[in-house]
C-alpha cells in the first residue's frame, strides 16, 4: 500500500472512531468493494475466543525458555504457585512470563467449568488476553462468577473484561483503541 497520508488517516480515526475497511489486490471497483464491505459481518456479538482457545487442558512446560532475556526475570523462579490459565487466545510469551515468575501452569479451554478448575486445587486462576467482543464470551465470565471468592483471580486485557463482566459491569466499546502514549 502506498500513497496513503497516514497522519490524515490517524486524525480521521481519532475524530470519527474505528472503521471497518477493505483492501483488495483483485477488485478495483470502489462501488463493488463498498458493497462487499457493507455485507461483511461486524465483530459485535461474535465469540472469536472459541476459535483460538486450546481444545483441551494441558500443562504448560516452558523447557525452551532462554536462560536470560532483557524483558523478564533473568531466570525462572522455582514453581511456587499452581495456576490454572483460561486460554482465551493467550500469547505464549505471557505463559512464559508466568513460569518465570514461579507459576506451575495448567492451561484450560475458554469454557472449562468452574468446578473442574476448583477440583485442580489451584492457588490462583489467570484469565488471558484474547480477541473480539467480551460480551460474546458468556461461558467464560459465567465460570468466573462461580470462581469469585473461592480462589484468587487475575487477568490481562480480555481477562480483565471477563472479571469485570462477572462482577456485573457493562462493557462499552471505545471510539478507537488505546495503543500507548503517542495518540494523535
What are the residue ranges of the model-derived segments?
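Cysteine-nucleophile active-site neighborhood
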Residues: 119, 124, 128-184
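RNA-binding accessory domains that recognize and position tRNA/RNA substrates
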Residues: 1-120, 134
Amino acid at each position: 500500500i502506498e500513497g496513503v497520508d497516514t497522519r490524515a488517516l490517524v486524525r480521521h480515526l481519532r475524530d470519527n472512531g474505528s472503521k471497518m475497511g477493505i483492501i483488495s489486490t483483485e477488485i478495483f471497483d470502489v462501488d463493488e468493494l463498498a458493497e462487499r464491505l457493507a455485507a461483511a459481518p461486524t465483530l459485535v456479538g461474535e465469540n472469536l475466543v472459541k476459535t483460538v482457545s486450546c481444545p483441551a487442558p494441558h500443562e504448560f512446560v516452558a523447557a525452551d525458555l532462554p536462560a536470560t532475556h532483557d524483558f523478564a526475570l533473568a531466570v525462572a523462579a522455582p514453581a511456587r504457585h499452581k495456576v490454572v490459565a483460561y486460554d482465551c487466545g493467550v500469547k505464549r510469551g505471557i505463559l512464559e512470563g508466568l513460569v518465570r515468575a514461579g507459576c506451575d501452569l495448567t492451561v484450560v479451554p475458554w469454557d472449562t467449568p468452574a468446578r473442574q478448575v476448583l477440583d485442580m486445587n489451584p492457588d490462583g486462576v489467570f484469565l488471558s488476553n484474547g480477541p473480539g467482543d467480551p460480551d460474546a464470551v458468556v461461558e467464560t465470565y459465567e465460570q468466573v462468577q462461580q470462581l469469585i471468592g473461592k480462589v484468587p483471580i487475575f487477568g490481562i486485557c480480555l481477562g480483565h473484561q471477563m472479571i469485570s463482566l462477572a462482577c456485573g459491569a457493562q462493557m462499552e466499546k471505545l471510539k478507537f483503541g488505546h495503543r500507548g502514549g503517542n495518540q494523535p
